[in-house]
Each structure stands twice: as structure tokens, then as C-alpha cells.
């Protein structure tokens, strides 16, 4: 008999976008499979009035649930931080935990600037990310083959193995110009890489997937089709992996990996630097 998962509310509180706190909370909470976490995102808590509303909400949840919710905070304003810290939650101050130690090590005080890590509207890094996103969108699924020489990496694999989300994640997070190109039954019959990408062998990295998982994904898109049959998926995956081995192309299986793990592996294998 399967026991009912424990439920716990999680509040992600920030005076900016909350992206940092949310990313950190996902990484930490994923270690506890037996708990069904209920995340509540509360960005732009930048006034005392908003902070009081947050405290009331957290306290109400603690009273109704009978257990204190978990609170991840990247609040910077000292007054707002002090107010929310008094709530009846398990309060985790992500910036304070690390910033004070760094201040001590450097002998300097931090700027306490809200949203500093995301204030990039006019920066070169921001423009590089936008350029990378536009490039990846234009070069998705082999639809635009010009300027492949400008790609930092070209992802290969059968349809629906995770090429598109990985390309976009690399672009958005690391400003990597990632193109992706499908391997199709026509390529397997020819027994050669598509001519379009053959000149860029040094940029190629392959993605694969377990046939059973591929069949599930394809059935969501085109139910009961030849494209989604398990036998067809087994054939395509086997042929794609055979081709990548023969051509000396590094590759990995995406089946049990998160998008973050896939992207990190690609960066390491291709030798790209994080931005």
C-alpha cells in the first residue's frame, strides 16, 4: 500500500524576480521525494506593506496546516528582510547566509542592491543572450541552415529527444548559440550524416533517449501513429546511436537527466565556457 505523500507549503520571497531563490529551492527540495511541496512564488516584495501581506499569508498557512511552511528568501532590504524573518515559517536567507561570509573574507561591505544579478538590460551579456536565443530559434530542428558556422554547438538526435529545450536553455542561461538538427530515417538509409552539417563535425554533440520514453513522448504529439510506435522508436534510436559512434560524435542519453544536467554536460564535452 502506497502512503500518501507529505505536503508542505514553500514560499519563495524576493524583492526582485525571485529567479535565484526559485532555482535554489528546486535544487534543494528535489532531494526529498517523499514530500509533495507546494511552491508559492512571491516576487517584487519591495515595500513594507507588501512584506506585511507576505507575513500574514505565511502565518495563516502555518496555522491552517499545523506545520510551518518553508520560506526561501533573497530579500535584500534590511527592514523588509527583518519583517519577513519574523513570520512563522522555516526562514532560509539565501543571500545573508553567504554575503556575510564574503564580506568578512574581503573586508568589504556588499552594495545591498536589489536585483543586481538581473539588471542587465544594457549590458553586453544581456545582448549576447538575446542574440543566442534568436539564433537558436532560427536554427531549430534544421529549419535554417545558413550561418551554422556561427553556432557554438549543433545538437543532433532523433525527433523528440530533447534537442529544442536544450538548445534554448543553453541560449537563455549561457548565451550559447545552439543549433539543433534532426536525424531521420532517410539519413539512416544513406548511412551518413546530413550533408548540411557534415562540415561542422567539431561542433556536433548528440542526444539520445530510451525508445520506451521516446514512444511515450511521441504518442503525446501524434497518438497511434507509425512515428510513435515502439518498434519505430527502437529502430531510430539504435540507428542514431550507431551513426554517432561511427562518426566519433560524443553523445548522451537524456532519459533520466534534467535539462540542467544535459546542458552542463554539453558545455563540458564541447568545451564551452559559462557566461
From Swiss-Prot:
The keyword Transmembrane helix does not apply. Keywords: Kinase, Nucleotide-binding, Serine/threonine-protein kinase, Transferase. It catalyses: [pyruvate, water dikinase] + ADP = [pyruvate, water dikinase]-phosphate + AMP + H(+); [pyruvate, water dikinase]-phosphate + phosphate + H(+) = [pyruvate, water dikinase] + diphosphate. Signal peptide: none annotated. Belongs to the pyruvate, phosphate/water dikinase regulatory protein family. PSRP subfamily. HAMAP family: PSRP. This is Putative phosphoenolpyruvate synthase regulatory protein. It comes from Bordetella pertussis (strain Tohama I / ATCC BAA-589 / NCTC 13251). The lineage of its organism: Bacteria, Pseudomonadati, Pseudomonadota, Betaproteobacteria, Burkholderiales.
Amino acid at each position: 500500500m502506497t502512503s500518501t505523500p507529505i505536503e508542505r507549503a514553500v514560499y519563495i520571497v524576493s524583492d526582485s524576480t525571485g529567479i535565484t531563490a526559485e532555482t535554489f529551492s528546486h535544487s534543494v527540495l528535489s532531494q526529498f521525494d517523499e514530500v509533495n511541496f507546494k511552491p508559492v512564488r512571491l516576487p517584487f516584495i519591495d515595500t513594507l506593506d507588501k512584506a506585511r501581506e507576505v507575513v500574514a499569508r505565511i502565518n495563516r498557512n502555518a496555522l491552517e496546516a499545523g506545520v510551518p511552511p518553508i520560506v526561501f528568501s533573497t530579500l535584500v532590504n534590511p527592514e523588509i528582510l527583518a519583517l519577513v524573518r519574523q513570520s512563522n515559517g522555516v526562514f532560509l536567507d539565501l543571500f545573508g547566509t553567504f554575503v556575510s561570509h564574503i564580506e568578512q573574507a574581503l573586508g568589504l561591505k556588499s552594495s545591498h542592491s536589489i536585483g543586481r544579478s538581473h539588471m542587465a538590460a544594457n549590458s553586453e551579456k544581456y545582448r549576447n543572450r538575446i542574440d543566442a536565443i534568436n539564433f537558436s530559434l532560427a536554427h531549430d530542428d534544421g529549419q535554417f541552415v545558413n550561418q551554422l558556422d556561427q553556432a557554438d554547438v549543433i545538437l543532433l538526435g532523433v525527433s523528440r529527444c530533447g534537442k529544442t529545450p536544450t538548445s534554448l536553455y543553453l541560449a537563455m542561461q549561457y548565451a550559447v548559440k545552439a543549433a539543433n538538427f534532426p536525424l531521420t530515417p532517410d539519413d539512416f538509409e544513406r548511412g551518413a550524416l546530413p550533408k548540411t552539417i557534415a562540415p561542422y563535425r567539431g561542433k556536433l554533440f548528440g542526444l539520445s533517449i530510451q525508445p520506451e520514453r521516446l514512444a511515450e513522448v511521441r504518442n503525446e504529439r501524434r497518438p497511434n501513429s507509425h512515428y510513435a510506435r515502439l518498434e519505430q522508436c527502437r529502430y531510430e534510436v539504435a540507428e542514431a546511436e550507431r551513426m554517432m559512434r561511427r562518426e566519433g560524435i560524443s553523445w548522451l542519453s537524456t532519459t533520466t537527466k534534467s535539462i540542467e544536467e544535459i546542458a552542463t554536460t554539453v558545455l563540458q564535452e564541447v568545451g564551452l565556457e559559462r557566461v
